[in-house]
From Swiss-Prot:
Residues 1-338 are annotated as: Uridylyltransferase. CDD domains: ACT_ACR-UUR-like_2 (cd04899), ACT_UUR-like_1 (cd04900), HDc (cd00077), NT_GlnE_GlnD_like (cd05401). Pfam families: GlnD_UR_UTase, HD, NTP_transf_2. One of its GO terms (molecular function) is phosphoric diester hydrolase activity. Keywords: Hydrolase, Magnesium, Multifunctional enzyme, Nucleotidyltransferase, Repeat, Transferase. The keyword Nucleotide-binding does not apply. The gene is glnD. Residues 339-699 are annotated as: Uridylyl-removing. This is Bifunctional uridylyltransferase/uridylyl-removing enzyme.
Length: 888
């Protein structure tokens, strides 16, 4: 690689030192051309560092500092020769003694020239050796900087001092402990995971800093300049070096593109850039493949790379601790406890008896994890053993998987009562799980390009198992009281664990992942000794793992017919119990924001109602009249001491049977009391209370007012202005043209029922808006969140007829956006449609809402009318989505 514009010639020909700025632009252009013509990112990064060395040396001489006894050092990434297009140029000017006034003036001119002439935006420190000693003693960052410093030009006698200073001020142990604590804090800032949706490729676990960490600690002890030198010292293997170098090149290349796209030193792989960078790496989508195929494959490579780096970081630093730090501790005496012919405990961690254990006895691979799963006192795996284990993972082939002894060991791990989740995480991390179940290996690192699934598929799967395990722990029983009780009585927990492992295992293949996963599970279960009935139960759970959540989300579970239909699909309590535990664990493992007490109450209601139907007999028809009478009786029992039965009956006469079928006795009593206390006052009634099903973050709003065309649209517009998210709505019109509306809302700030002033503000805003029958409140203009602008969601509208209710069911799926429900409500109002109920769901960037509507005469739309309205509604949604895209 030859840069065609040598700096000295360039400055001479332009007769102006300020030409360095243009020279930098020219060489950057040449570097980009070299990259596009096939030069490796390592060549480009090194060339850029050398060119900056050349420029700084030129400016150093121009400032007259070449005649001084000072030294100019590159530090940070520049010291490591890791320079990307917009990387900081960090330098240190070092003096053996205090700096003279003359040199201070020259240094000032040199630093100014870096800004004014070269536009380097440098990070600069000026220190004497004594300054370095004082600062390095108390500042880990300074000590780290000194370790990777590199003399660019100046006094060669100073080159030895930076590392000598660190050796004097930090011992191996103090430096190692401090760097490990620093890494732990850094990882915590990134959720201790490699699989964030928008990862920081430099600082997150598995990023560039994790590779730097290995270098810093090794360089401090072994006094080497390159990671490559550690191979000759026996600290890392050739294979590990190859993995690190390939990972480093890949991450540098991503960072290279991030810098050029954002025109700054950017390390975050944001949604803004993921698609474009995927294309630059050659990832494309063939016809028929999912729309996000290319970006998901690129991110899969990233997550797998980050996992490799993270694992090597863990292993190599543990190896350093065990081989260098611990043996040097005062009074250290290694504690060894024999286990069997394959394993022993060394200082509380598992270690092989000899280095050929895994090659001579392959079953020891799974035996190791059996010991970990069933002996909580074991603290982990020794680093040397871990290195052998990672290499042994490659031995797991079909012959290994078909071995009955290995199958028995694997199922013994799954049935462990102690730490199944941690053990499976280790098995995944070290390559065992993905090799033993090859289909699981295919989903490792697989992300779904949306805001709903915030974990990779493999991480989500193991979190699901963690959640299932938590259902048996007392500290989580208060958060999941019903499901914990159900889980405790499951006859075979291994059935739900295997359903969890396989429920998403077919994602990314195309086709129905539930169906394909069920097929994989049956084959696996048969091979592992399950009866045919047990195999079918596991497969049924996988095939139907979305049934319960979709029923609660999209259907009216207060409708006895809905419950009966759902219960008939299950057939018995065994299927209900297994599906309930799997579903709750699944939702909680998908996205922490998805689970709230409102959703918990829906799941609990669906489970309870279905349980009652199954226990009373699936063949029994629903006795609607008996349900109505029972509900009325329970409600009247609550009201009898406050009002006469005649007064109560007078109110109830205005309400239809549907009201008493779908509202609870408690809610009916609440509504009736408010109406009777209000008397003949024409003003709307607005009441707020916590949701009856112990949904602490959900608020019920009851509205009783004269019916009018824009009632729903007006209400949701006001609620949107009040920062309240509607989850459920039920609108019932009484015979005297009064409407009884119940909304369940989630409060974005969580203060609605604890702040009397805010509660009063919400009530007054609703009363005022509902009292002005001819006015419709305008929509709030809110800033669209950045992430939403990068998702191309196809807007869909589906209108069907519910023959029982004689209502149209309008299902919409669109990009979530501020004020969406209010905007949709306005469209219904303009079309003269009455909304009777609504089910609202926000799944990441996607809104999936269902409305039950009729025309003003109470009749459903005809087929032609529904077709026309569907087209109008989709057009409006498309226009709203286009506005969001145009803001990007």
């Amino acid at each position: 690689m030859i840069i065609t514009s040598p700096l000295l010639d360039y400055v001479t020909s332009h007769q102006d030192i300020k030409a360095i700025n243009q020279w930098r632009a020219d060489v950057e252009q040449q570097l980009q051309e070299f990259y596009e013509n096939g030069y490796s990112i390592r060549d480009i990064v090194l060339a850029r560092s050398n060119l900056i060395d050349e420029a700084l040396t030129f400016l150093w001489k121009h400032a007259g500092l070449d005649q001084s006894d000072l030294g100019l050092f590159a530090v940070g990434g520049y010291g490591r020769r890791e320079m990307l297009p917009y990387s900081d140029v960090d330098i240190m000017i070092l003096s053996e003694n205090d700096i003279s006034p003359e040199h201070e003036k020259q240094i000032s001119g040199f630093i100014s020239s870096l800004w004014d002439v070269g536009n380097f935006k440098p990070g600069t420190s000026v220190r004497s050796i004594q300054n370095c000693v004082e600062q390095a003693t108390n500042d880990l960052t300074v000590a780290t900087t000194l370790i990777e410093s590199r003399l660019i030009t100046g006094n060669p006698d100073l080159a030895k001092w930076p590392r000598r200073i660190v050796s004097q001020t930090w011992t191996d142990k103090t430096f190692f402990d401090a760097k490990m604590e620093e890494q732990a804090k850094r990882h915590a800032q990134h959720n201790n995971t490699e699989s964030n949706l928008e990862p920081d490729i430099k600082n997150a676990p598995g990023g560039i800093r994790d590779m730097n960490q290995i270098g810093w600690i090794a360089k401090r002890h072994f006094r080497v300049n390159r990671i490559y030198d550690l191979v000759h010292l026996g600290f890392i293997t050739e294979y590990e070096l190859k993995v690190l170098e390939e990972a480093e090149s890949f991450l540098w290349e991503i960072r290279h593109h991030l810098h050029l796209l954002s025109k700054r030193d950017e390390n975050r792989l944001l949604f803004d850039h993921q698609r474009e960078i995927a294309a630059k790496f050659g990832y494309t989508r063939a016809e028929g493949q999912p729309v996000n195929f290319a970006v998901e494959q690129f991110m899969k490579r990233y997550y797998r790379t980050a996992q490799q780096v993270s694992t090597l970081n863990e292993m190599l630093l543990a190896y350093f601790n065990e081989s260098v730090i611990t043996p040097r501790l005062p009074n250290y005496e290694r504690k060894i406890e024999e286990i069997n012919e394959n394993f022993k405990l060394v200082d509380g961690k598992l270690a092989v008896q000899h280095h050929k254990v895994f090659s001579e006895n392959p079953s020891a691979i799974l035996e190791l994890f059996y010991l970990l799963a069933n002996h909580p006192e074991i603290e982990g795996i020794r680093a040397r053993t871990l290195r052998l284990l990672i290499m042994a993972a490659k031995r797991i082939d079909q012959e290994f998987r078909d071995n009955p002894a290995h199958q028995a060991l694997f199922m013994a791990i799954i049935r462990s009562p102690y730490r199944l989740y941690d053990t499976l995480v280790d098995m995944k991390r070290y390559g065992i799980l993905g090799n033993y179940i090859p289909a699981f290996g295919q989903i490792m690192g697989l992300m779904q390009y949306d805001l709903f699934h915030i974990y990779t598929v493999d991480a989500h799967t193991l979190l699901l198992i963690r959640n299932l395990n938590r259902f048996k722990e007392p500290e989580f029983a208060q958060h999941f009281p019903v499901v914990s009780s159900v889980f405790q009585r499951l006859a075979r927990r291994d059935i739900v664990y295997l359903a969890a492992i396989f429920h998403d295992i077919a994602k990314g293949r195309g086709g129905d992942h539930s169906e394909l996963g069920a097929e994989d599970a049956i084959e696996f279960c048969r091979a592992h000794g399950f009866t045919e009935r047990e195999c079918k139960l596991v497969a049924w759970l996988i095939h139907n793992h979305l049934l319960m959540s979709l029923t609660a989300q999209k259907k009216d579970i207060s409708d006895p017919d809905v419950i009966k239909e759902f219960a008939e699909k299950l057939g018995d309590m065994e299927h209900l119990d297994y599906l309930y535990t799997l579903t709750v664990a699944d939702i909680n493992a998908t996205n922490p924001k998805l689970w709230n007490t409102w959703r918990a109450s829906l799941m609990r209601q669906l489970y309870t109602y279905s349980r009652d139907v199954i226990r009373s007999g699936l063949g029994r028809p629903v006795d609607y009249q008996m349900l109505i009478e029972d509900t009325k009786f329970s409600a009247s029992e609550t009201l009898v001491n406050e009002f006469s039965l005649d007064a109560v009956e007078k109110v109830w006469q205005e309400l239809g049977d549907e009201y008493f079928l779908k509202e609870s006795a408690d809610e009916i009593a609440w509504h009736t009391r408010a109406i009777l206390q209000h008397g003949d006052n024409p003003a709307p009634i607005v009441l707020l209370r916590a949701h009856r099903q112990s949904a602490q973050d959900a608020v019920q709003i009851f509205i009783y007012t004269q019916d009018k065309p824009n009632l729903f649209a007006t209400t949701v517009a006001v609620l949107d202005r009040m920062n309240l998210d509607v989850q459920d709505a039920r609108i019932i019109t009484a015979t005297k043209a009064f409407s009884l509306d119940t909304y369940v809302v989630l409060d974005r700030f969580g203060t609605l029922l604890t702040d009397p002033e805010r509660e009063h503000t919400v009530k007054e805003a609703l009363i005022k808006a509902l009292s002005q029958s001819d006015k419709y409140p305008g929509l709030m203009q809110r800033r669209i969140p950045r992430q939403l602008r990068h998702f191309d969601i196809e807007n869909t509208v589906d209108i069907t007829l519910n023959p029982v209710l004689q209502q149209n069911m309008v299902e919409i799926s669109t990009l979530d956006q501020p004020g969406l429900l209010a905007r949709v409500g306005g469209l219904f109002m303009m079309q003269g449609l009455d909304i009777h109920s609504a089910k609202i769901a926000t799944l990441g960037e996607r809104a999936e809402d269902i409305f039950f509507v009729t025309k003003k005469d109470g009749q459903p739309m005809t087929t032609d009318e529904a077709h026309i309205f569907s087209a109008q509604l989709k057009l409006a949604l498309d226009e709203a989505s286009n506005q969001i895209v145009s803001q990007h």
